[in-house]
Amino acid sequence: MWSSAEIRKTFLEYFEERGHSVVESSSLVPVNDPTLLFTNAGMNQFKDVFLGLDKRKYVRATSSQKCVRAGGKHNDLDTVGRTPRHHTFFEMLGNFSFGDYFKREAIGYAWEFLTEVVGLPEEKLWVTIYQDDDEAADLWPEISGIDPGRIVRLGEKDNFWSMGDTGPCGPCSEILYDRGIEYSCGAPDCGIGVCDCDRWLEIWNLVFMQFNRDESGEMTPLPRPSIDTGMGLERLSSILQGVDSNFDTDLFIPIIKRIEELTGKAYEQGERGFPFRVIADHSRACSFLIADGVLPSNDGRGYVLRRILRRALRFGRFLGIEGSFLYKNVDVVCDIMQEAYPELLEKQDFIKEVIRLEEERFLLTLNDGLKKAEEIMERARQRGDNVIPGEEAFMLYDTYGFPLDLTEDMAEENQFTLDKAGFDRSMEEQRQRARQANKGEDLLGQERLLSEKLAGIAPSSFTGYENSRDESVLLAIIKGSELMDKALNGEEVILITARTPFYAESGGQVADCGIIKGQEGLLRVQDVKKLSAWILHYGIVEGVLTTGEGVSLQLDDPARMDTARNHTATHLLHRALREVLGEHAQQKGSLVEPARLRFDFSHLKALSSEELSRIEQMVNEAIWKLYPVTTTVTALGQAREMGAMALFGEKYGEEVRVVQVDTYSSELCGGTHVQNTGQIGLFKITGEGSIGSGLRRIEAITGSYALEYIKQLEDELKKAASALRSSPLELAKRIENLNNSLKEKDKEIENLLQRLSRSSSDELVNKAFQLNDAWILIEEVDIEDPGSLRQNAEMLKDKLGRAIVMLASIKGEKVSFVCFVSKDLLEQGLHAGKIVAAAAQVAGGGGGGRPDMAQAGGRDKSKISEALAEARKMVKKTLS
């Protein structure tokens, strides 16, 4: 029997033997692609190659790509576990041709691999083609010998692929496996393209990228057609391992067995096994996403991870697990996948810790959600209402991760109803906002359009590592998206020159600013960006600039130097963080500009003042040691052998630039730096905080900015010391003494308030009366705060013993009621929820709650006496 590891290895070796370069799976976090939330197909990392924006040394490639489909346009989250095939995380095996081979070879490779290498029976294989693709219809029988009766023509929806509204596109051909009539849905017309039953299992999709579609929809043949194929490893494994579901393969069974151990329950097929399948799938997705740098948060990718993780926890609770458990599955996931993805093993402990902390956070969140739900119901009672608004239920779900079914249960327990239509409305509004926010495809279309118009313009040459000024030729002027011959005074334009010292925004470093000067005008450069091979200078024209004229380019030297100080400082900071906190404290993002630096890194808790002090001291010591800073351009593999760190979220070519700070630090980096650490002068941390679960941020300044900051701190310290009649060095002790004095005063005030409260309680107790050995206290009080009202009522109930206590208070125009019934009176039929509901109804409101404790609200404060009288009447009747 084939193992999944053998299938993956055999696939890659098969294509490598046929001239394909084996390319590592790219990260699940797409690099420089705003159209994607997660990598969801093997072709994602080759998108720029297909678009002609990037070139590789190879024209044939093969890969086993990590993919996630959860969130965004491609979202299988709610289907996971309900079907045998859908997953949040999966692997896509693929082979690609960039203008090399085409349909004949792609069909031949696919057929040979399936029938001869892994041995699938030919008679079990079916093929779909695009309805107008006669070429594929002829090639399939010729190459494979397949019976034309097993070739099905389908329309554009099923068998035509495109990258977007415009750009590369083409027909596709899918290979399906017939699992047999016993798996049929039983419909008379059951067949490929008619139904989605489990008889017809889609295995491999071959995309024939042969056209370019323009804005009018017209398609013209590509000069060099390409191939993009994808086959799910999980699906092929299920066939070759002879099991009915992907979840029964060796990719999932060890995880499911671990869940059985954790729950003490046996896995079953069908509906009973649904929670096991969800947890197994989500364990894989969480492990791989965290390994690729995604951390739980409230937006973007982190929000999707949080949803996946919390969904798994909910199903764990369904299986009877109350505490943290999901992190215990990570070891099993790593054991299954470590050979193909060694990064999992390297980050195993970090992945477990992130998941464990998020689990604990969610358990607290559930408690917070319970409190919030109580507050929502209390506000409804104050309004005289017993409906939980849909938008508030959605807030519980979205902000607190509070499952809707728990909100529904709470509503039922408290005799409330839930506005489900309002909840659905809020959910749809959020989806609309997400769709509005995802403008990446528009951006990609604009870049593609601009690239097409610049096709005849020579690439820009960056000279800014060596120079801060240069002489060049103005190659192009762009206004809007049109090429212009001239740029006039006041116009906002983009300039492209043959040579430029201006650094384009990249890798967290902001663009250079400065001036591009021509014979009759100039451009004050406000921003610089890179588009493929061109460097674009953005700004507003003063005078007139003309295409083809000679221009002088001059950077703002002080700003460039300040930026260089901060960029080199981030490298020193990165090293110090890993020294003090551990190797897991790796860069997750940065901002480098003249006035400051910002550095994001992975760490699971706030830094102590001692840790911050050590980090700051280490950076300053590296500065004062006057380390030389050198750069080397070398092959990516050679750079890794040199020990250079590759940073998360960066896209590297085959040649990379290594920035070395003596033996202290070595990183792949394209930014600008000082020549010697002494040029940084001084480093000062100004802030540290959380920007998401497991993600911290340090803000800092260097050079003259750091010196000015320290002077400001000193001035403020002197002012504070003067105000408190102290010296700066004795200020902390003076503040401590003042705090101690304030605490003593607070205690005195608290004692006075408690004595006052006891006095008020004693007065109320005297108003209680007895009926059949039960104390009854139903009174109006002057306590506006609902929490205090509830606290006082409970205290009075405890003081009276066998009692029913109901208090009412007025706030504004509304009335609040709270009622407590001692447990020994519940058997006599007293029900707090019914009592407050009756009283609230008299006051024009509503509410209810549990038999032992309930709250309600009324709209008419003038009816408070009648409401209390109604409550007394009801209690007397019940006890009599």
From Swiss-Prot:
GO BP, sorted A to Z: alanyl-tRNA aminoacylation
CC cofactor: Zn(2+)
Molecular function (Gene Ontology), one example: tRNA binding
Localization of this protein: Cytoplasm
SMART domains per record: tRNA_SAD
CDD domains per UniProt: AlaRS_core
Keywords associated with the record: Aminoacyl-tRNA synthetase, ATP-binding, Cytoplasm, Ligase, Metal-binding, Nucleotide-binding, Protein biosynthesis, RNA-binding, tRNA-binding, Zinc
Top-level enzyme category: ligase
Cofactor binding description: Binds 1 zinc ion per subunit.
Chief location bin: cytoplasm
Cellular-component GO terms for this entry: cytosol
Enzyme Commission number, as recorded: 6.1.1.7
Annotated SUPFAM superfamilies: Class II aaRS and biotin synthetases (SSF55681), Putative anticodon-binding domain of alanyl-tRNA synthetase (AlaRS) (SSF101353), ThrRS/AlaRS common domain (SSF55186), Translation proteins (SSF50447)
Catalytic activity line of the entry: tRNA(Ala) + L-alanine + ATP = L-alanyl-tRNA(Ala) + AMP + diphosphate
Binding annotation for Zn(2+): 567, 571, 669, 673
Keyword check for DNA repair: no
Superkingdom to which the source organism belongs: Bacteria
Functional summary from the UniProt entry: Catalyzes the attachment of alanine to tRNA(Ala) in a two-step reaction: alanine is first activated by ATP to form Ala-AMP and then transferred to the acceptor end of tRNA(Ala). Also edits incorrectly charged Ser-tRNA(Ala) and Gly-tRNA(Ala) via its editing domain.
HAMAP family, sorted: Ala_tRNA_synth_B (MF_00036_B)
Domain notes: Consists of three domains; the N-terminal catalytic domain, the editing domain and the C-terminal C-Ala domain. The editing domain removes incorrectly charged amino acids, while the C-Ala domain, along with tRNA(Ala), serves as a bridge to cooperatively bring together the editing and aminoacylation centers thus stimulating deacylation of misacylated tRNAs.
Sequence similarity: Belongs to the class-II aminoacyl-tRNA synthetase family.
Name this polypeptide is given: Alanine--tRNA ligase
Naturally occurring in which organism (per UniProt): Syntrophomonas wolfei subsp. wolfei (strain DSM 2245B / Goettingen)
